[in-house]
Amino acid sequence: MDDNKQKALAAALGQIEKQFGKGSIMRLGDNKTMDIETVSTGSLALDIALGAGGLPMGRIVEIYGPESSGKTTLTLEVIASAQKAGKTCAFIDAEHALDPIYAQKLGVDIDQLLCSQPDTGEQALEIVDALARSGAVDLIVVDSVAALTPKAEIEGEMGDSHMGLQARMLSQAMRKLTGNLKNANCMCIFINQIRMKIGVMFGNPETTTGGNALKFYASVRLDIRRTGAIKDGDEVVGNETRIKVVKNKIAAPFKQAETQILYGQGFNRNGELIDLGVKHKLVEKAGAWYSYKGNKIGQGKANSCKHLVENPAIAEEIEKLLRDMLLSPVGEEVEKADVKKDAKKDAAEALK
């Protein structure tokens, strides 16, 4: 760039900073803290599928799926992980269905959890905005988008038509929230429900409620489905669950996590460790027997899980090895790619 352009740019940058404050414009490389902070989902398989070790702070996340698929359980697991890291969390219970006893069983400190049961959708979103602007809250969960009822609909009659009211309300909220959440480094998780589109002949007839704004503004979208039942004899004790990363702005999307949700316990972490350990050859499997470092840990997955519960040091060791092997900080892939490019360049120059 020639000197005149350089001077003009410096003057423009100076004027912008004077008018809007320091840091209102900068060169992207000047920002040294480019690593994205994440919060674990409580499931190692899902953390790996997300590529960054968890859900990103300062972003909007959408979790959707059919009824009783584990949406609220997943968010309560995220809250428990965030609280363990010393973060302040809030739960906006628009469905008026939060069970404090179940939340406690999943490891949530209910004495420290902020909870609101708003009367209208506008009130719920104003509370979210106020909490984000305070800068004191690190994680907000809204359960659910479908239950965010506009004030006009609540005050109207049963048969009244309110076309697009909820979508307009959410669209405005997304525009206001995105910047405030980023500035406060606060994550907002929206739980959503599934509806069927009428008259769809080809393609997927499923859609989520609340219009398209949330789909655009969300950095991560997770589709959670129940794929089967876990039985102990004749008794059903949990669900086989598949979670698909439908959208991901912080790593590669479309990865899937297969996990188990046990009733009253949450994710079957030890089961995940065994499955991932076998897949990545840290745990050996011979017939029905599982062994680690040559020592048998159990016959069958259930007995192996019990062994890991009784020996948490082994479970921690396997988890650490898996995290070191499968998770790299966001941005490391870019650095590796740059190193490869430089190596190719050097090789080409050497050949000349």
Swiss-Prot record:
GO MF annotation terms: ATP binding; ATP hydrolysis activity; ATP-dependent DNA damage sensor activity; damaged DNA binding; single-stranded DNA binding
InterPro entries (UniProt xref): AAA+_ATPase, DNA_recomb/repair_RecA, DNA_recomb/repair_RecA_CS, P-loop_NTPase, RecA-like_C, RecA-like_N, RecA_ATP-bd, RecA_C_sf
Keyword terms, alphabetized: ATP-binding, Cytoplasm, DNA damage, DNA recombination, DNA repair, DNA-binding, Nucleotide-binding, SOS response
CDD domains: RecA
SMART domains per UniProt: AAA
Residues at which ATP binds: 65-72
Any single Pfam family the record assigns to this protein: RecA
One GO term of the biological process aspect: SOS response
Amino acid composition bias (Basic and acidic residues), ranges on this chain: 333-352
Localization, UniProt: Cytoplasm
Superkingdom of origin: Bacteria
GO CC annotations, alphabetized: cytosol
Region (Disordered): 332-352
Its job: Can catalyze the hydrolysis of ATP in the presence of single-stranded DNA, the ATP-dependent uptake of single-stranded DNA by duplex DNA, and the ATP-dependent hybridization of homologous single-stranded DNAs. It interacts with LexA causing its activation and leading to its autocatalytic cleavage.
Family: Belongs to the RecA family.
HAMAP family per record: RecA
Descriptive protein name: Protein RecA
Species this chain originates from: Photobacterium profundum (strain SS9)
Annotated gene: recA
